[in-house]
Amino acid sequence: MKKLVLLSAFVLLAFQVQADSIQNTDEETKTEEQPGEENQAMSVSFGDPEGSALQDAAVGMARPCPPCPSCPSCPWCPMCPRCPSCKCNPK
């Protein structure tokens, strides 16, 4: 029985030593990274800084044209001088 307890204590000690060596290796790897890395910032953009034509079209579709004074059925009234071409939406 004493041999079993002693053997399991050695096995647990071996696992602990191995885990400590792995943890120390991870800490060394973190310190070997470039100094000042936490102060660096990077911005990534996948588009035109002023916006794309697709975004402009989506904004135009989201905002309906204001009703013209002569026709209450606007924004789709063909008689309105502004709404058929959607020039009343700012871009």
Curated annotation (Swiss-Prot):
Residues 20-65 form a propeptide. Sequence repeats lie at residues 65-67, 68-70, 71-73, 74-76, 77-79, 80-82, 83-85. Residues 65-85 are annotated as: 7 X 3 AA tandem repeats of C-P-X. This is Alpha-defensin-related sequence 10. Residues 1-19 form the signal peptide. Keywords: Antimicrobial, Defensin, Repeat, Secreted, Signal. GO terms for biological process: defense response to bacterium. Belongs to the alpha-defensin family. It comes from Mus musculus. Residues 21-52 are annotated as: Disordered. InterPro entries: Alpha-defensin (IPR016327), Alpha-defensin_N (IPR002366). Apparent precursor of a secreted, cationic, proline- and cysteine-rich peptide that contains Cys-Pro-Xaa repeats. Unlike cryptdin, the proposed mature peptide region lacks the structural motif characteristic of defensins. It may have microbicidal activities. Paneth cells of the small bowel. It is found in: Secreted. The gene is Defa-rs10.
